[in-house]
Amino acid sequence: MTFEVGVVGAGAWGTALAQMLSSDGREVLLWARESEVVREINEDRRNGPFLPSACLNPTITATADLADMARIPVLLLVTPAQHLASVLGGIGRDGGDVVLCSKGIEAGTGRLMADVARDAAPDASIAVLSGPTFAHEVADGLPTAVTLACAGGEEQWLRLSTAIARPTFRPYYSDDVTGAEIGGAVKNVLAIACGVVEGLRLGQNARAALISRGFAEMQRFGLALGARPKTLSGLSGLGDLVLTCSSTSSRNFSLGKALGEGASATAVMADRATVAEGAFTAPVLADLARGRGISMPIVEAVVTLLEGAAPAREVVAGLLSRPLTAENPLV
């Protein structure tokens, strides 16, 4: 069997992407780490642990062998950000397109995912898919738009859009890979903060203010690293931020909500099968911002909460007591 597209990672998002990509009858190969997940997908057309609501299309084939993914022309990488290097390196990718669908910053190195991927697969053409997406809605065929940022420019975009676009899944072209990555990584951290506001029952005014001020932090950080303002105000930045900061369907938002209700980050994350990437991104992001002299008080507050260094109400009170200043400066 010949596969045009492969998806590496059978969590909720990876499975949803495989479901969307196979919606027109195309064959899609989906890699899962767990042998039981592979069996369930192939035999029962289900992925109970990660996307139980979906009846999976018959043209999805699951495998537990990374080597099966090596020669597929287009690979979508949907593994947790902290495992991207080891998984992509294990595939032994030689050329082809690699589309990064995980949002985060590598702990210990501070590298964005595209830099990690270039080291792990130096001959591959890298792109980033990012935007306002909930896995269950994509799997259900509801309309979705994303940014597809291509390091290879329009030539790569034309190749990938043919492979990825579907009637209900619309990718928009960009060549600002850095901007697309930063938007997704930072919004995960800000979603935790918005969840805290929900957990503390501070109201919609507070949430709207936090989204706006959080977006200012995203802009400051992104512009310092070379992102374009239009990218940050697009689907992969502001669009993703608004969605993720408004619903408990977001793993990061629900983590923050639990923190606001008094739970510890350690306890919440130990009880989950899925990953809230913002919890891993927050301390790395804060370190990078400090090193560049970038003010990100909301991100710093999230780190304080994740470390359990202060109660949620005290942390929020600290944000509210900061010196008054102008709204718009990005410095």
Curated annotation (Swiss-Prot):
Its EC number is 1.1.1.94. The keyword Cytoplasm applies. Sn-glycerol 3-phosphate binds at K103, G131, T133, K187, D240, S250, R251, N252. Keywords: Cytoplasm, Lipid biosynthesis, Lipid metabolism, NAD, NADP, Nucleotide-binding, Oxidoreductase, Phospholipid biosynthesis, Phospholipid metabolism. It is an enzyme of class 1 (oxidoreductase). Pfam families: NAD_Gly3P_dh_C, NAD_Gly3P_dh_N. NADPH binds at W13, R33, K103, A135, R251, V275, E277. The active site is at K187 (proton acceptor). It comes from the Bacteria. It catalyses: sn-glycerol 3-phosphate + NAD(+) = dihydroxyacetone phosphate + NADH + H(+); sn-glycerol 3-phosphate + NADP(+) = dihydroxyacetone phosphate + NADPH + H(+). Pathway: Membrane lipid metabolism; glycerophospholipid metabolism. It is found in: Cytoplasm. One of its GO terms (biological process) is phospholipid biosynthetic process. GO terms for molecular function: glycerol-3-phosphate dehydrogenase [NAD(P)+] activity; NAD binding. GO terms for cellular component: cytosol. Belongs to the NAD-dependent glycerol-3-phosphate dehydrogenase family. Catalyzes the reduction of the glycolytic intermediate dihydroxyacetone phosphate (DHAP) to sn-glycerol 3-phosphate (G3P), the key precursor for phospholipid synthesis. This is Glycerol-3-phosphate dehydrogenase [NAD(P)+]. The lineage of its organism: Bacteria, Pseudomonadati, Pseudomonadota, Alphaproteobacteria, Sphingomonadales.
